[in-house]
């Protein structure tokens, strides 16, 4: 029996070692290493937090990862200091200030945070139920989790599942992660603890 027990333990440990998670911090808390700024809006580090703020041009702006990410779980915290529209893009590419890909909405309560919007394409693919409008807390830190695997996307805000969607076009998407400043001005959002686990 001791031989069988040893074999079981060996198989168990080899299985757990193979499943070792590869989690990467996307933001080092000091500078924008690993990111690319698109547009003229403001991206900077303050108090070890990543801040996006509308500039005088009041145009779209993006901060995108240098690396592409295919299947992953992204976790982050965001705090909205002003009204305004932001978002987290996945499997996306940016050319100038035109983005191709999919956005997980980050907006004030009542404006579909956690929903999926396809820019320059089909528009809204899915919005959370209106009963979830009050999940986002303005002026406070909110937890967001985004899981992208194959053609399926699930989003959570403050541990509440916001949406789940299966979409063949998303399944074919290739690109990185990007944070957005919407046009129109008046936007200021803080971000921290951006961590991505490759699946």
Which residues fall in each region the model found?
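Short, small-residue-biased leader/transition segments that mark boundaries at the very start
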Residues: 1-11
